[in-house]
């Protein structure tokens, strides 16, 4: 049998009798079997070669193991002995083979094999000169290490190697042996080890930004790989991007957050070989002074991505993309669309995509005014460390900035409002992580930062320091995340703060409510939020207040609490500062969550726990004697007598309108209406009863509106600043004005969704009355409930499975939604066996225009400007949301649904009704998909 590594004959030099077990003798035994040609290698050894009839009968009679082994030695012929010894030899050396790398190509495999043989021969010869058993073992280990180092360019785990190169390495090994080798558990384990050793950017950690001293190197066109979930949206591709012919079909499927391609982990190397890179996000320092035309075109051109499945409309013919169902072995998989990952332009690949688009300059689409182009983001050259020992080590601790954002002339029409995004993935359950991935698709991934992996916003703020005059900031998180960014800006000493918008993903979101962004971000596409930042915002200001704490030395504590602190957790207040019962409940909740973080890991659980603790405190009235331990002065006026008169349990210093998750404690009266930028803070008082009544529309007791507050405490009292509670020792607290920061306040103007902008120019016509040529189609109408919508709005296929079909309407594809509402409402009223009582305030659901993000409700105010084809696929169904419709869980508990009776359909005109088909006929479909520019029926 011939083996992969040519084991040479060992030198004829004889050694003493004491060196009986040496590497030389082992090599001689191996070479003896290697010189004997294999007579029947192509056939696997059968069991009858090892056992005779005598053995079988002996085994049946209870023959012991020693006698069976002796009979085997008698029966085995000479070839069998050699074959067994050869297999044993292979197991001795296979560990060295498995450590070799995958970079060696099949063309130079013979040359590399000779080099490996020569190096192994010299290694074995040198090892044979050892003088003891211990030295022999050491020589064998060094030989294996030498093999790994000198020929570290092979890997049995590589599929190409197991199929092609193993055949060249082992020409006399039969196919079944090579297949068995490829399926061995050792090979599978080695492949898994190699996969884990390569860094995969699963959640955009700090490795995406900071290069370590290892082998990892950040590339300008690096993919941002994420776990691919099947059916995540109506337009999510599930086919491997390398193609059906080259796909290895092994490994976990991952999806790039920046360009939305899908590939197996074992196909990543093929993507690099085929030059299927992601969109370029930055440029290197080497191309700064004299950039070539090729590098400039690569930074400013489109980044086209092929799609097997796509929603929306073609930018050339304005027709939707017909989805194809792929059946294994029956239809060839073809790409139906091509889209740019920058500007999001989409075209039919066969008829509508022009070749000159490949060299066209990309304008970055509807969000071009906030997308930071890759020509602006510069990666600086690495600084080499000096060999000299620094005389002052402290001066050399300053970290080196690896990236910097600087406007250049390469992009003449740069963004007027570049956006810097900070996302807290832990906020809002899974919403923060999903927002991070969606923003990487809509914007440049290099302008979106995970605030937790980088341990704060400092890295991103320093990177964008040179564009501070144009910069806008978007904070995706709660009020605490906003305060984190503002405090970091204070530490950086910026001369001016950029205006800040908020995506509310926290629990309370009172600051987001005050700025017009709402209390919960759940029913709006992120692309629409980006449009709102551009067109629906004004710059306002937010007051911030400084809190100084000094110990009250005149007060002697009788007993000290272990949790008592001498300073507040925050020194700058943005939302509110409270003393007493409110802070006591917050402190209890903080301790409960710290002790059991797994029990309080969602917004709903937090609200339930907070409400339960508040209810307990309502009856206990823990701080009913608060007025006995504090002295309060507002603008130099002592208001302590009023606190004692009202017997307050809580004192609140309020800066914004909302408090405790959307309540308005000051009231909505026009007199002395509070403002977040008037330079004054509102002082209110509560009892435990009025605190509980806030959630039902109650108000607090107004004490004062002032610009300076002084509080003296004579006892350790719980306090909280912007939701951060603590038990503060007796202190003298002074609250004064700190600064004003600009904020982006959202004001509802005109709708600015991409649908509305597209409809005006779809066919190049504006408000001109042209005879409609749209077809009357039979469109099924299905209804879903609110609970199912909240659970499955990110997965359209799963949401559709929970729906119930209420009937069919005959409607024009370009009919407006308000006219379709009349037809559907009539269908609900005339339904004979509807299993629930419908609500008149049902809503349309849009699963087409923002399919990359999920399904969203359509506002009633937008129904007169959106058509049926804008919110649904006319080949599938029209989806509506009814709050009265029971969820799928309730339907499983109660059998509501009976066999549906025939339902009369309604139409928008006197056209004949179609009873033989539920959808548009195949003939009309062919006409619509033809190459004709216009079709008249």
From Swiss-Prot:
Domain of life: Eukaryota
GO molecular function terms noted in the UniProt entry: ATP binding; ATP-dependent diacylglycerol kinase activity
GO biological process: diacylglycerol metabolic process; intracellular signal transduction; phosphatidic acid biosynthetic process; phospholipase C-activating G protein-coupled receptor signaling pathway
Chain ranges of the DAGKc domain: 414-551
Keywords in alphabetical order: ATP-binding, Kinase, Nucleotide-binding, Transferase
Catalysed conversion reaction: a 1,2-diacyl-sn-glycerol + ATP = a 1,2-diacyl-sn-glycero-3-phosphate + ADP + H(+)
Ranges where the record places region Disordered: 44-69, 106-145
Acetylation listed as a keyword: no
A cellular-component GO term for this protein: plasma membrane
Protein name in UniProt: Putative diacylglycerol kinase K06A1.6
Organism in which the protein naturally occurs: Caenorhabditis elegans
Higher taxonomy: Eukaryota, Metazoa, Ecdysozoa, Nematoda, Chromadorea
Gene: dgk-5
